[in-house]
Structures are given as structure tokens and as C-alpha cells.
Amino acid sequence: MSMTTIAPEQVNRIVWNQHHDPFEILGSHPIEQNGKTVWVVRAYLPNASAAWVVLPEQRQEYPMQTVHDPHFFECIIETSELSNYQLKTKEGEHERVSYDPYAFRSPRLTDFDLHLFAEGNHHRIYEKLGAHFTEVGGVKGVYFAVWAPNARNVSVLGDFNLWDGRKHQMRKGATGVWELFIPEIGVGEHYKYEIKNFAGHIYEKSDPFGFQQEPRPKTASIVSNLNSYNWSDEDWLEQRRHTDPLTQPISVYEVHLGSWLHAASAEPAQLPNGETEPVVIASELNPGARFLTYRELASRLIPYVKELGYTHIELLPIAEHPFDGSWGYQVTGYYAPTSRFGTPEDFMYFVDQCHQNNIGVLVDWVPGHFPKDGHGLAFFDGTHLYEHADPRKGEHKEWGTLVFNYSRNEVRNFLVANALFWFDKYHIDGIRVDAVASMLYLDYCRKEGEWLPNQYGGRENLEAADFLRQVNHLLFSYFPGVLSIAEESTDWPMVSWPTYTGGLGFNLKWNMGWMHDMLDYFSMDPWFRQFHQNNITFSMWYNHSENFMLALSHDEVVHGKSNIIGKMPGDKWQKLANVRCLFAYMFAHPGKKTMFMSMEFGQWSEWNVWADLEWPLLQFEPHQQLKKFFTELNKLYRSEPALYTLDFAREGFDWIDCSDNRHSVVSFIRREKDTENFVVVICNFTPQPHSHYRIGVPEKGFYTELFNSDARQYGGSNMGNLGGKWTDDWSMHNRPYSLDLCLPPLGVLILKMDKEKTAKALGS
């Protein structure tokens, strides 16, 4: 037996998992012996009673001896070169032959990768960090890399090593990234990182860059290949690249995939190759029900949205989250679509099918905060790595969550790359950034003494603002034609202005003021609305300060607020008429549109994340008629350019009359870009019809009634103008001509001059 080549204290550092670079000890090393170079192979094999080095090309085996520990093995081989060796181990009654992870010494991360990551500018860091199935030296396996700069040791845990952190200890690089290639494992492996801090405490963490996770309540990451899906949306992406979305119709159906519709547990799931088991809903309200899969949703949700005529689907957060009741807004797996509904490839299929049906996909993105779950980002390497250490900057007490440290380059890089990732790998068409105000203000939901000012003594979070600018600048550079939408509830200036003008760089901002004004106005008894005309007109005073999206979202139908129809006054007929009036005005008003699921058929109850929507209501005619109303409203909106091409230009909107508060009537003109086409909109916000209501119009001719929210097919009283009206040579509202109209109760009319009919009649 030859003499050992390693000191006991070095062996102990491996045995006790205390070495920052196990490659210094384990694997193969050239040494000088008797004046010549030989090779020593060392391995720590906790479950082995005996081991051999196998040279498959030479068909030779060399027995290994134990040194300083019964499971630490060493073997000296007299050869000038050593490569592609394997280890044969005896574990109980079984023998196995495998490649040694510590034989693969070359790091996959280059110095340039690490440099870019350290300065916060590696835009595709998700292709480097995380778990990646690859091939090294002709051997297939998985490369693992994780950023944990303050950890004492990091190991990979998984089924492949019986979740034993001693077996696959990682190497730490100069920038705090730990890495290891594990041969002969592949896609589908479950894994975590075992992280030990300098106090000896051990944390088991999911992979921050993991592409897939186990269904809750389990928390392991899963090795996944995101490059295997064959996309069929090239035409969609090419058209998007050359289209300005701000001049296009955007009508968004906001949906929570986990509660739109459920399936009975006995209903077979559409799953590819049986890869994923259906996930049961954890709710007593729906015992035995399960979530629909992404593929089932593709076959049910997409045709429904297409029938209704929406241009986009907006998904409440689909990144992995442990608690169903968070609606997805407490994310632990930023790079993993939730496994509640299937695999990453299943979600790709869903997006692909949306695009093939001419429906865009928007995703809610949550870069403002993250939960404290032990397997997630919180206290990741035994220190406050992703969050601020000081709770005055690092904690949202109202939500019980932690705040990202945007001043740390690597954290900012994690988030910036994450935004780009969803567009790159999943072909989404836009993000809605949640709770932007909570990011921008250091004193958000904090009392005096509970927050720290910025370097200038102000309450603005300058690092967060810079982060948002960086995200939006890169987003539109890499993916022209996409949407970045801010849910920003304050008067922070220039949210939807380009970054080169000093703006935050979003191209749309939710108009929270309009939403509050509208819901306040429509909840009033109509006879009192005359005293609150400003609710209707005020939005046009500031409309051109931002690119606004008008949104009636999930936030307005929860927490005791009731659903939209429940907010309306009057009997059932008036409630439905008010709903039609509200949405017809919304679609005629400048700005893009978003509405939450269930509003389209008049659900009475609040949204409940644990239950289906009230689909049985569609058995009843009033709810069928309301659904028909939204179908026709979307059809009109998409077909009439005057309603969307100049949403954000002053020349796209003119009041005809906004001062008739006595009757609670407003009228205005919407104009089409680069043409002389326009539509006239008249809104009557009371149940009192007007048989002779005159408004001024700019041109003489016949005005066709394109849309009447009071039509019988929508459940209305069917008051209208028999298809249209000729103008009178009677000036009104500073216009040379006027129309004598019949205004229906709680109704909205949209008219357009028929130029062909007018020309024939007037002989021009």
C-alpha cells in the first residue's frame, strides 16, 4: 500500500463539508513521485465500502485505499495522462460505475460572464446560472451554478445522491458563484441547494434560477430543458416586431388560471406522455376538484376569449408560488411557470396556441417584493442577500414580505434578466408590473420613523426607479412591439414616457384615477349623478400626461367590494343597464382596455380564488345577453380605428358637450389617425330617456348608429334611432350641424357618418 498524499486536516474539510473548493482535493491531480509524474485520484464516497478507479479505454481497474476516514478514498496511477476515468463503488451488496464529478474541472462560466453579472449587466444570466442539461467531454449531465457569496459551503441535493449534501459539494468562484457539473443525470431530476453559513446553520433552498418546481407543498426544483419545444408562432412574432402597439386595439381579458374553471378530479387530464399528475385544489369549497392544465386551458380558455373578441389575455402571476391564496403575487420561483397547471413545455404550448389564434399574452410580474418562505430567496445564503438587511428598507409589513435590494448589482441583474427571460423563452407579449408605487416610495405604507430617506433626504426610491428604467429600456431594445404596463397608483411623473426623456420607460400605465372615479360615479343613484359630472369628465384633463390603460381589474371585485354588477344601483334591469353603460363608455374613452374575468357575463358574487366562476348564470337570458354585449362591443372596438389609433394624441378626442350635468349626458368625438374619419359618442347616465336630444356635429350627412348599448339583443329597452339620423342645418355646440337624437336610458350611442350614403344623397 502506497503512502497517502494528503494531510488529515484536508480530508476533514471535505468530510465535514467545509471546503470552498473541493476540486483542490478531490478528482485527479498530477504529483511527483520518485522523480516522475504520476496521477492521484481522490474521492469522498460516504456510502461506499470499497472503490476502484476504472479506465474504460485501457480496460483497467485500480483499487483505491481509504485514508484518514473510512469513506475517503485515494489511488495513485502511474500514467503520464489521465482522462475519462470512472469510479466503481461497492455499496452494500451493489456495485455501480459512474463518472467522477470532480474530473470535470473546467468551469462553464467564463470570467466575462462573471464580470457582467457582478456589474448587473448579464442579460441572459439564466443561461448560465441554475441547472442546465449539457455535455462535457462527451459525457452528458447537468451543470449547476448558484450565487451565494456569503455561504461557507454549498452542495447539490437530489434523488441522485439520496439528498446527501456530502456527495456533491460545489466550488466557489471569486464572485461568489458556486458551480458543479454532475455527470449522468438529466432532465426531470429533482434537486435543491444545501447552503451552510459560517455559523454552521444549514438551509435547503430551491434554485433561484430553476426553470421548474414541484407542485406545492413540495419545494424542490426540477431540471428542465427549455429548448425542446417547437414553436409555430413565427408570423405572430414577426408582425409584432413591426407594429406599434399604441396605435392598435388592445382589449385585455384578465384571468386567474387557477379559478377561471376547474375540473372534477375524475376527469382525465390532457398531459403529454403522462409527465405531470393533475394538481388538486386545496379548498373545502370545491372538494375533489383539480386545476385545469395549460393544455386544457388552451382548448377551453382560448376559444372563449376568441369568441368574445378580446385581443389579449392577461394572466395573474404564473411564476411559481407556494400559497394559492396569494393569487400568485408572492413568488418563490421567478423563472418557473407554476407547476399547478403542468410543465414549462405545456405553458409554451398555451402561449403558442394563443398566438396562432391571434391573441396576445400578458403576464403579471412581481419585482417589488417576495415572501419569507424558507425555501425561497429570503436569507438565501445565511445573510440578507436579495433583500435589504435593515427592515426599514427591506420589509413590507403590510404584506409580510421582503423588498428586493435594487442597489445590489447581482439582485438587479436577477430581476432584469427575469423580465427578459419570459419574452425570450415563453414568447409572451407584455408584462404588467405589479405594485409599482410600493417600489418607488421608501415610505410606502410606513409610519414616521419606519423608513429611511434617500441620499438627498427624499422619499423616492432612486435605485428602484433606475431599475425600472433599465428593465424597460432593455425590453424594448430586445423585443420591439411588446407591452410594459405599470400598475402605479400615485402621481409619479412620466411613468409611461421613454427613458431618454427622463421617464420610467413603460409604454402604458393603469389609470387608477379613472377607475376610482367611474366606480364611485356608477355606484351612485343616477338622480344624484348630476352633482358629480366631474367624475366623468375629469380624466380628460390629464389624459395626455401618460399613455393610459383603463382597467377594471381583480382588485375591484374582492375584499367586500362586490362584483361590478353588485356595485350598481337599482333593480336587476338597471344594474345590467349600468354595467353596459359603464363598459360602453370605457371602450369609447381614450386608452387601452382591461377587464377581469366574470365581468363579461355579470357574475353577482365577488371573485373567490378557491372556486369556479359562476358559469351556471349563463343558463339565464340576461347573462347571455350581457355576454353578447361584450362580444359586439369588442367587435366594434377592433373594427373602428377611430376608437384606438389616436388614444394618446390630443387630436384624437374632442368634447362636443361635457357640461350637461342636469341630464347627466356627455358627448364627444373620437378621430382616426391619418384620415378624416371620426365617430360620435353620446352617453346618458340616467334611466331617463330623451326623445329629442340635440348635439352638434362637424359635418353634414347621414350618421349611422354603429352601436347602442340599450339594444334588445343586449337586454335593453331597444330605444334608438332606427339605424341612424340625418343632420339638420342647425348649429349647436360650436358645430355647424346637429343631430336630433333619441337617447336611451342608461345608454351609450356610437355613430359614424356614412360618407357613401351622404355623397349619393347630396350629389357630391
Swiss-Prot record:
Q: Which SUPFAM superfamilies match?
A: (Trans)glycosidases, E set domains, Glycosyl hydrolase domain
Q: Does the keyword Nuclease apply?
A: no
Q: Which GO terms describe its molecular function?
A: 1,4-alpha-glucan branching enzyme activity; cation binding; hydrolase activity, hydrolyzing O-glycosyl compounds
Q: Tell me which GO cellular component terms the UniProt record holds.
A: cytosol
| Annotated EC | 2.4.1.18
Annotated disulfide bonds: none
Q: What class of enzyme is it?
A: transferase
What GO terms describe the biological role, i.e. biological process, of this protein?
Answer: glycogen biosynthetic process
Catalyzed reactions per annotation? Transfers a segment of a (1->4)-alpha-D-glucan chain to a primary hydroxy group in a similar glucan chain
Repeat in keyword set: no
Keywords per UniProt: Carbohydrate metabolism, Glycogen biosynthesis, Glycogen metabolism, Glycosyltransferase, Transferase
Q: Which residues are catalytic?
A: 434, 487
Pathways involved: Glycan biosynthesis; glycogen biosynthesis
Its biological purpose is as follows:
Catalyzes the formation of the alpha-1,6-glucosidic linkages in glycogen by scission of a 1,4-alpha-linked oligosaccharide from growing alpha-1,4-glucan chains and the subsequent attachment of the oligosaccharide to the alpha-1,6 position.
- Kindly state the subunit structure of this protein: Monomer.
Entry similarity comment: Belongs to the glycosyl hydrolase 13 family. GlgB subfamily.
Name this protein carries in UniProt: 1,4-alpha-glucan branching enzyme GlgB
User: In the record, what lineage is assigned to the organism producing the protein?
Assistant: Bacteria, Bacillati, Cyanobacteriota, Cyanophyceae, Nostocales
Q: Which gene encodes it?
A: glgB
